[in-house]
Amino acid sequence: MTKIRKAKETMSAKERVLRTFAFEKTDRVPIDYATNGSIHHRLCVELGIPGDNYDLLLEALGVDYRGVAPAYTGPLLYPPLPGRQVDPLYGFYTRWVENESGGYHDFCDFPLQGADEETIRAFPFPSPDDFDYDAALEQIKRQKDYAVYVGNPGTGDIINSLDYARSNDNG
């Protein structure tokens, strides 16, 4: 088991991030964490973190940020496909692709590939009423010592999001 050695910290994660965005001096550079499942698992094993526990790993790494999101509670909008995962919000399909590092989920079965305007207009999207905002508020309260963000790197990424639904050739 590997142990991460960190320098003594003199400020909270939230203070560090706020100072960084204000272009003020901090005790260290703020840290975030995002990876695929295979690498996450290997990192947890190496650090002796049981059950691939995400929160324990964030603590071990000294991650300053915590993401929050309201849970989707609405109806199933997209049909399940054998051997695939489907994104419940946007209808993106992924399949497991093995590689020498373990593997990853890659986009496939593009639901709007070759679709005409009418099909695109009729494509279902979740209603804002189908989310548990109270649970998101509780997440925020639990993360009060961290810099909290909503969304993910793909939230504002219109071009890649179109590719996930229409394919690289049609995005």
Predicted regions and their residues:
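Catalytic cores of TIM-barrel enzymes
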Residues: 2-171
